[in-house]
Curated annotation (Swiss-Prot):
Lipid-attached positions, S-palmitoyl cysteine: 555, 565
Extracellular side: 19-532
Protein name (Swiss-Prot/TrEMBL): Hemagglutinin
Carbohydrate attachment residues: 29, 54, 182-183, 305, 488, 497, 501
Any GO MF annotation of the entry: host cell surface receptor binding
Subunit and partners: Homotrimer of disulfide-linked HA1-HA2.
Length: 566
């Protein structure tokens, strides 16, 4: 700042103790920071983290419905009826299933469950079923029920899968047997059957008499004939032959017919699907606790109102969308600019250009004033409430945008058959990557908009005051206005609430402006005179110095001689 400006400011501040009003915004001691598209770690007065990272660490009831733990049985052992799993046969309803990945009781006889992954996926969407007898064992005719030491019940007695019947010869005969099941339940029914593949032709004859038996399974839409494939396979539980178990979901009114002369594992019990829903089969060793949750994962329950979570992708229930980011902070306040230590001349109040105000209560934007009654500060609640409403809408819009788009993708897969739905699980990683990026980009954009909105709100408030005061004040350019008339606290309130009467103070303001302009002109004239005198004196001193320096130089070099005569 040049000497003239300093002198003018000193004269004005000394001669005129003007009333002033400033527009500003809140600043706090908050350490919150957010990222925008162009900046990182921007200080803000407040923010919220949209990503949930906490969970219960336990299995909980989901919306009041308890889960079911399969105990020592795997899903396969439970669904086909391993005799060691009889304690689970009464299960009817669950919110989700829990399977111990190392459960000892699976398929007790060597073999496999066909399309096991698809059946698991089907049961991920079932909430309740009932177990029902499909075909009575006694109706099949001249065959015996088979049992094996590989499948022992809880008493140690040889047995077999409780939902199937293994037919073997009776009185050295195995005639062609045939039965049909008609689904008259009005609901979908899960029907299972199987084929036993002996280790040799001799074993085939021993069990079924016929050397080349067959099994024919027929529905209204397909038919398949099974031949026994003899051979030694890797075994366990003392058995080397093989059993393959099949299943079909029959819709109301459909029927299925079984015809065989050896090797058939016939259906006995099936499952009536009473309610479909959104379920899951979780596999983890965490315990079941007495708790309730809105969202369950294999590592724990999630109870939150946040938009996203990064705990686990395969979550069940009313869950935030999974993203890979561990933190996404959304600005809910304004840019946090600390107040300057020195406020104007002599500690005077200052506007938003010089930083925020730590003393602003119940608002983000407001006014400070200075008059004969002292210094006051007040929030502008109307502009603050509008900003809060905008941010609330912004948060809701983020939730709607993410939910709507994500669910529309999942909806496309739910309209096609189950195998393609299984593919949806496999591409979820790619979908998660896309939505993690989208979520981060959306939050960065919204943070930019929020901070720009706050800046605009402060400028709009400043412009509103400028238009209200008109020529009755001088805009100092820092967010403050120097009033050209006396303005007590009541007058300041009219400026804040927009009821200020400009004409009431116009004459006083006009006189004050003329007085200030006169002081400025006189001050400028005095400054110019002072500068002229200082310039003349300085020039003379420099000239005398040059002359003395020249004389001394000539004397030293012998070119100058002084003669003194008496």
């Amino acid at each position: 700042m040049d000497i003239r400006a300093i002198v003018i400011s000193l004269l004005i501040s000394t001669c005129v103790q003007a009333d002033r009003i400033c527009v500003g915004y809140l600043s706090t001691n908050s350490t919150e920071k957010v990222d925008t598209l162009l900046e990182s770690d921007v200080p803000v007065t407040s923010s919220i983290d949209l990503v949930e990272t906490n969970h219960t660490g336990t299995y909980c009831s989901l919306d009041g419905i308890s889960p079911v733990h399969l105990g020592d049985c795997s899903f396969e052992g439970w669904i086909v009826g391993n005799p060691a799993c009889t304690s689970n046969f009464g299960i009817r309803e669950w919110s989700y299933l829990i399977e111990d990945p190392s459960a000892p009781h699976g398929l007790c006889y060597p073999g496999e469950l066909d399309n096991n992954g698809e059946l698991r996926h089907l049961f991920s969407g079932i909430r309740s079923f009932s177990r029902t007898e499909l075909i009575a064992p006694s109706s099949w005719g001249e065959v015996n029920d088979g049992a094996t030491s590989a499948c022992r019940d809880n008493t140690g007695t040889s047995s077999f899968y409780r939902n199937l019947i293994w037919f073997v010869k009776k009185d050295n005969r195995y005639p062609v047997i045939s039965r049909t099941y008609n689904n008259t339940t009005g609901r979908d029914v899960l029907v299972m059957w199987g084929i036993h593949h002996p280790i040799s032709t001799d074993e085939t004859k021993l069990l079924y008499v016929n050397s080349d038996p067959y099994t024919l399974v027929t529905t209204s839409s397909w038919s398949k004939k099974y031949k026994l494939e003899t051979g030694v396979r890797p075994g366990y539980n003392g058995q080397r032959s093989w059993m393959k178990i099949y299943w079909v979901l029959m819709h109301p009114g459909e029927s299925i017919t079984f015809e065989s002369n050896g090797g058939l594992l016939a259906p006995r019990y099936g499952y009536i699907i009473e309610e479909y829903g959104k379920g899951r089969i979780f596999q983890s060793p965490i315990r079941i606790a007495r708790c309730n949750t809105r969202c369950q994962t294999s590592v724990g329950g999630i109870n939150t109102n946040k938009t996203f979570q990064n705990i686990e992708r395969n979550a069940l229930g009313n869950c935030p969308k999974y993203i890979k980011s561990g933190q996404l902070k959304l600005a809910t306040g304004l840019r946090n600019v600390p107040a300057t230590s020195n406020r104007g001349l002599f500690g005077a109040i200052a506007g938003f250009i010089e930083g925020g105000w730590p003393g602003l209560i119940n608002g983000w934007y407001g006014f400070q004033h200075q008059n004969e009654q002292g210094v006051g500060i007040a929030a502008d609640k109307e502009s603050t409430q509008k900003a809060i409403d905008q941010i609330t809408t912004k948060i809701n819009n983020i939730i709607d945008k993410m939910n709507g788009n994500y669910d529309s993708i999942r909806g496309e897969f739910s309209q096609v058959e189950q195998r393609i739905n299984m593919l949806a699980d496999r591409i979820d990683d790619a979908v998660t990557d896309v939505w993690s990026y989208n979520a981060k980009l959306l939050v960065l954009l919204e943070n930019d908009k929020t901070l720009d909105m706050h800046d605009a709100n402060v400028r709009n408030l400043h412009e509103q005051v400028r238009k209200t005061l008109k020529a009755n004040a001088i805009d100092e350019g820092n967010g403050c206005f120097e009033l050209l008339h006396k303005c007590n606290d009541s007058c300041m309130e009219t400026i804040r609430n927009g009821t200020y009467n400009h004409s009431e103070y116009a004459e006083e303001s006009k006189l004050k402006r003329q007085e200030i302009e006169g002081i400025k002109l006189e001050s400028e004239d005095n400054v110019y005179k002072a500068l002229s005198i200082y310039s003349c004196i300085a020039s003379s001193i420099v000239l005398v110095g040059l002359i003395l320096a020249f004389i001394m130089w000539t004397c030293n070099s012998g070119n100058c001689r002084f003669n003194v005569c008496i």
